[in-house]
Curated annotation (Swiss-Prot):
Homodimer. The gene is purA. One of its GO terms (biological process) is IMP metabolic process. GTP binds at residues 13-19, 41-43, 306, 332-334, 415-417. The keyword Metal-binding applies. One of its GO terms (cellular component) is cytoplasm. It is found in: Cytoplasm. This is Adenylosuccinate synthetase. Its EC number is 6.3.4.4. HAMAP family: Adenylosucc_synth. NCBIfam families: PRK01117.1, purA. Substrate binds at residues 300-306.
Length: 432
């Protein structure tokens, strides 16, 4: 039985993690975010009502679940307050269900200013960040000058630390990027206005999770972004600023690494990517347009159109390695309905003519990589909302089986629509 289950993306994010976390939390006592910030965008559809969460874990809609933001998450007080208000206006008692680690680094206005100034300065070489201050906040953490939730317990000391770090960053903003300084008093006042709310939710997350483990409670760890955006293992420098792989669970929450029981990789039936960076199977033709339109491929956080392409099993195999995946949840299979043929990338042809079945690491090494495809018959029947495997067309079943063969990982869950009821659970991770 798997008490500690990790749910993470196996591609470049936007795989459909939020819905699956929400579905599986029916049995969980805790849902934990362990990396990223409000650059994530998790969309849940329950009884036709749509909820988009950026920072708060997807378990917040369940009254039986306690949601936890772990130390690996960079926390924007402004974003958290906005999200809390939206949920509380709908009658969801967020403060009764949400806990925070005091070690969460804070994202403040100067981080956002730095993020946007840098992207503008990069010009054509812009990474395509969400402009939310995520990267600069992680930089401050590593440089040991970052302010954390725990600093808010001593308001006087917080004000002194804030002044010091803002002098440092404002010097850079004004003298290097030639933009306006961020106002110290405003940042201080805004943060102090919500300090008591934040500190009232603080808990020792590592201790809580260890006690939960000893009791045998079910815990779900919710990843944000995707494996191929990992700061260490992704398409660097076109990556996010945190560890999106399963290793981030231990460092970003305080759970001992030996206690992860099952890692569920969310796998979209085709590939998408937001922002710049390598994408060997990207389609620029009418099929790419079809996938974008049918899949409604626009970012939940930025509204940007996602780049679309065929499923890349070479890249997915890298995700299998990095995360020691136990099983897949295949999402958005219905988007492929109506295509005469579907393709799977099974290898890459390198610029020197070699065929390889593993991904390069640095983004520069992906230049000139061509996908080698395996073509399979498509299906005309609708798979949307199908709740039983026997209701799927044979061609769709063949596609599923081939993915399992190419990756060596079973598909344990199949999602056929945005609602939590439109799902086939072939093997429940908590029972695995």
């Amino acid at each position: 039985m798997g008490n500690n289950v990790v749910v993470l993306g196996t591609q470049w994010g936007d795989e459909g993690k939020g819905k699956i976390v929400d579905l599986l939390t029916e049995r969980a006592k805790y849902v934990v975010r362990y990396q990223g910030g409000h650059n994530a965008g998790h969309t849940l559809v329950i009884n036709g009502e749509k909820t988009v969460l950026h920072l708060i874990p997807s378990g917040i809609l369940r009254e039986n679940v306690t949601s936890i933001i772990g130390n690996g998450v960079v926390l924007s007080p402004a974003a958290l307050m906005k999200e809390m208000k939206e949920l509380e206006d709908r009658g969801i008692p967020v403060r009764e269900r949400l806990l925070l680690s005091e070690a969460c680094p804070l994202i403040l206005d100067y981080h956002v200013a730095l993020d946007n100034a840098r992207e503008k300065a990069r010009g054509a070489k812009a990474i395509g960040t969400t402009g939310r201050g995520i990267g600069p906040a992680y930089e401050d953490k590593v440089a040991r000058r970052g302010l954390r939730v725990g600093d808010l317990f001593d308001k006087e000391t917080f004000a002194e630390k804030l002044k010091e770090v803002m002098e440092y960053h404002n010097f850079q903003l004004v003298n290097y990027y030639k933009v306006e300084a961020v106002d110290y008093q405003k940042v201080l006042d805004d943060t102090m206005a919500v300090a008591d709310i934040l500190t009232s939710m603080v808990v020792d997350v590592s201790d809580l999770l260890d006690q939960a483990r000893q009791r045998g409670d079910f815990v779900m760890f919710e990843g944000a972004q995707g494996t191929l955006l990992d700061i260490d293992h992704g398409t660097y420098p076109y990556v996010t600023s945190s560890n999106t792989t399963a290793g981030g669970v231990a460092t970003g929450s305080g759970l001992g690494p030996r206690y992860v029981d099952y890692v569920l990789g969310i796998l979209k039936a085709y590939s998408t990517r937001v922002g710049a960076g390598p994408f060997p199977t990207e389609l620029f033709d009418e099929t790419g347009e079809f996938l974008c339109k049918q899949g409604n491929e626009y970012g939940a956080t930025t509204g940007r159109r996602r780049r679309t392409g065929w499923l890349d099993t070479v890249a997915v195999r890298r995700a299998v390695q990095l995360n020691s995946l136990s099983g897949f949840c295949l999402t958005k299979l219905d988007v492929l309905d109506g295509l005469k043929e579907v393709k799977l990338c099974v290898a890459y042809r390198m610029p020197d003519g070699r065929e390889v079945t593993t991904t390069p690491l640095a983004a520069d090494d992906w230049k000139g990589v061509e996908p080698i495809y395996e073509t399979m018959p498509g299906w005309s029947e609708s798979t949307f909302g199908v709740k039983d495997r026997s209701g799927l067309p044979q061609a769709a079943l063949n596609y599923i089986k081939r993915i399992e063969e190419l990756t060596g990982v079973p598909i344990d869950i199949i999602s056929t629509g945005p609602d939590r009821t439109e799902t086939m659970i072939l093997r429940d991770p908590f029972d695995a």
